[in-house]
């Protein structure tokens, strides 16, 4: 299992509320409702940024998405689907600053702590 972790920044001109409305209300359902895409994704998480206090996050980023795939090859297959370039890329352009995208594919976590010691 691998995870795609992306730091997201909203497109210039969008309010934070508009960004979240599109990301949570339109983008996620688009992936979920497209079988050619959904079959590749094991889990799709959306994390809103905590804004108070101001020092609680990476300044300028509005959220993080974490998408789980069985393998790197499965992630590559997801992005190679024709529906990805037909639906997802144009939708991302509606609400994301794609130039500010920061992403990484990670392996299964090494758990350093799991609850109080």
Residues covered by each model-derived region:
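Macromolecular interaction modules
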Residues: 1-117
